[in-house]
């Protein structure tokens, strides 16, 4: 039996890296990414009401109105945490105040300077600060923050002449606001500012939290200040950054021997207790209430009885847009109108109805229907259907989209797109009573299984970080699954197999399959990796089907597709879809190198296979082989003796790793089609699959669903289709032997 190769009884592992990172590391071998850590005792800070000053918790609250720049509603601070003296702060403002008076001729210049002064005072007195301001309109504040950082005592160790950098954390995959902010701050990179994506920044701070929890020596932090821009609760990475920083801060408060954490500045457009509850109790806050026109909220009671997925609900949104467009055609609120819809399906419903009820093209052009945050300026009216598709990641890291009501955080984000200087109308397609009932403060539910494993890898108890931000039932189900799969042990610590699986670019299940295959010395291991890589990229299929021609009726087109399917079945069909994939790769390997892209391209062109999917599978396989090489695992890449029981071996591994992926298949005589039931959900079987399974013949047979997708039909109904099935012929069930004895 071939075992994992070890060094000093420990597997040598490299940091978690995805496929893109691995390719970048090949090109830039000298560039090192920060390491990552995890684990700690539970520290629950007392969360108090942030709307008032609490002398016990030393809360700092500043509220300031721009219309009266010299008037201060309330101001208090904790002198015990004031590391930077007032004189130094004054010096900072003296040095950073521009000499060019032409720049400050606007009526807001002195007012803004006073605002920034108070913001910096707030930041100087606390490790954590929440700014309820809009920083993208205040570039001067960024410059003063950088100057404030230079004047402070936060320098790089062993190089006191160089100050630590300020990290500006953005969601670069989000809306245009953060992209604009990235361009604005790009000029300040040489002035001590670094811009980082929020997901990458989580990996950067994990080592510090892990070291603090394990009570080992922690290096000084790589930055002196963290600025999170446009924070909102729907962004899981922003939430994790706050929780990780708070975890480290609580440990530092009890053990001052570890390095002091950087200051944390959280910038948001809608501050409430939901944010402050994630941070220490002595967090400061600053609210800038500008003299701007405010948004009028209108509740549409007629939408109350329209169901969340009904076509009438989204047609109603179009009718509301027409109503306000006619009402304010030449008056106020004549800017851009935005209708928020959950997906492309609802987008088409609204657009089609708008075109049928509005004939004026200029009026129609002003109405923007979107599933994301709009980039248009001058928005006057927002019509919110109050719906969205939220991602619910399963154990295979596949995201299933579920239609649901939005949370109050999302509602605030959508309302904030209205022009704050001219004001506008925010139409809620629900009654006020129902809105307050279902639009509640929800936890962030889009955490994936890898977010949990990442914490466990660094010895961080997931419950410490995920407390109050992830549903406890879901967290428990993830931990139970990881234990069944063998990724973690009973003490929630990574096993040898768990560390092995985290190295692979495949998901945890498929990586566990590779582990069992390798550990048992299975011949032709590379063929299994190629098949799993194809399944990972399968999507709607790997076969190329011709399009229907203009002069071809549906019957002729169907017959042409049937002829192509018969041709593919004659060449490659196995008993199951998995057997078919093995036949394809075995044929490729018999006559050439399966990792040669040019050879595989020609093979795909000759056999109606999707080269793009096959090329992705080859690249993924190469990444897997790189992991074997990097960790000094001996893998025999020679493909010999192709006559192997691939299907039986594959099925036996599925019993270990895909214990919850079994489906029940039966024939529905009323609908005249085969129906599959997966986790109590009704699915269809891909009718263009190439296999020999008689799906309606044996309802007692065990099937494994390995790839499925959701499609929208011509009738605008959503259906789930299983694309890859695996099962054993009845004869193989009778002669099956134990390939992996305990």
UniProtKB/Swiss-Prot annotation:
Biased composition (Polar residues): 60-69, 77-99
Annotated stretches, region: Disordered: 1-102
Biased composition (Low complexity): 18-28
Domain of life: Viruses
Start-end of Basic and acidic residues biased regions: 48-57
The protein's name: Uncharacterized protein L581
Taxonomic classification: Viruses, Varidnaviria, Bamfordvirae, Nucleocytoviricota, Megaviricetes
